[in-house]
Amino acid sequence: MRFDREDLSQFVGKSFIYNYDKGWRYELYVKNRITIDYRVHSGIVAGRWVKDQTVCLARVGENLYRVSWTEPTGTDVSLTLNLHDFVVHGAIYFPRWIVNNPEKIACYQNEHLEEMEALRDAGPIYPTEIIDSFATLIYMRDCGPDNEQVISCPPSELPENYPFCLPDKNLLPESAATE
């Protein structure tokens, strides 16, 4: 094996912004080895943002990482980030209740955990909707671990030219960082 599976040092503390082929924009901050924050800028659940989501992180190649989790909503997510080719592959398993009413989760989830769990329990769960899609990384920055300021507001409060207005250096090559 040409890489150390346990070494997540080049991944933890990074913030990623990516556009799915469907046109949806997501932002992911790998806060530490077991926690992420994220926000959804556009797509069926635009406006959603979450802090301190427990995850499983795995390094599966030299510049290849997997992030997987189950949300209080009943949604399961698995992301593979390829930092060599600047792509993300996402598999999102939405319960039927979210597909039917996505606006119900377009909020700051941390303030609505009991409501999310009640909606999940009320269902319906099936048939599950699988969203299997590629995304292109447009911005990557090193924010360090456990930085509470990386994702600290809803996407609606960000400047129109976000993330390109950030003072942090975009770590992607210029050819990869297109809007």
Tell me the role of every PLM-derived stretch.
Residues S68-E179:
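Beta-sheet ligand-binding and adhesion/scaffold domains
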Residues A58-N63, H84:
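A short, structured loop/turn motif at beta-sheet edges
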Residues Q10-I17, R33-D37, G61-S68:
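Short, hydrophobic/aromatic-rich segments at coil-to-beta transitions
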Residues D21, R39-H41, T70, Y93:
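Surface loops and adjacent helix of pleckstrin homology
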Residues N19, G23-I34, I105:
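Alpha-helical transmembrane segments of secretory-pathway, organelle, and plasma-membrane proteins
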Residues D21-Y26, R48-Q53, T73-L79, V87-H89:
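Short, surface-exposed coil-to-beta transition loops
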Residues M1-R25:
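Tryptophan-anchored aromatic micro-motifs
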Residues E27-A58:
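N-terminal glycine/threonine-rich, aromatic-flanked beta-hairpin/loop signature
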